[in-house]
Amino acid sequence: MKEQHLGSGVLLRAANISDLPELLRVCLETGDSGKDATHLHKLPNLVGEIYVAPYVIHEPKFASALLAGERVVGYLLGVLDTKAFEDVLLEKYWPIVKAKYQKIDYELTPSDQELIKELNKQGFSDESLTAKYPSHLHIDIVEAHQGAGYGKSMIAFLLDELKLAGSSGVHLHMSASNDRARSFYKKFGFIEVLEDANECIMGLTF
């Protein structure tokens, strides 16, 4: 991807493997519905190993890092074909991460316990969802840089990239209680597709 200058020294560029430590940090610092979740975890990298690393490693074409100066302050992650991506992860990624966390010899926090459950149930998205919304995306920006318009520019950029690549629709997962995010995505035309007490899946067709 071409670098996108978003103003005030903020840059969106392609993410790479060397960015992973910083991307994992951002994932942790936004892991509590956009707020810092560091205090909730004894396994600081696990949240990012579930929600960020798979994209950078196995779908780098649509993985971007947001930088303020030299510091990574956000990321934008996309997948063109969710089903194909999940096939790859099931074979090449999840077994490695599961093995890493198989034997933990100390008490975990409730948040870490939930992540371990999430890790162990990784599988496939509902076919009715991916049939209509085959692509998906994930974005996070640290709290100090939220509300500056960067997220809007980032999402618009990725939606254009997915459309150009031939996608017919995209979905995303978010906390059902995150009303701010819900309003944000609705401005792009996303609608609620599936929802329960904890999670909302929103979708957009092209």
What are these regions (language model features)?
Residues 11-25:
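A short beta-loop-alpha structural element at the N-terminal edge
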Residues 32-51, 89-98, 102-107:
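Conserved GNAT-fold acetyl-CoA-binding loop/helix
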Residues 41-63, 69:
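Active-site rim helix/loop that mediates acceptor-substrate recognition in acyltransferases
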Residues 65, 71-80:
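Conserved beta-strand in the GNAT
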Residues 83, 171-173, 186-204:
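Conserved catalytic-core motifs of GNAT/GCN5-like acyltransferases
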Residues 83-138:
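Conserved acyl-donor/pantetheine-binding loop and adjacent beta-alpha core of acyl/acetyltransferases
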Residues 133-135, 162-175:
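Conserved GNAT acetyl-CoA-binding A-motif
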Residues 138, 147-164, 183-187:
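Conserved acetyl-CoA-binding loop-helix of GNAT-fold acetyltransferases
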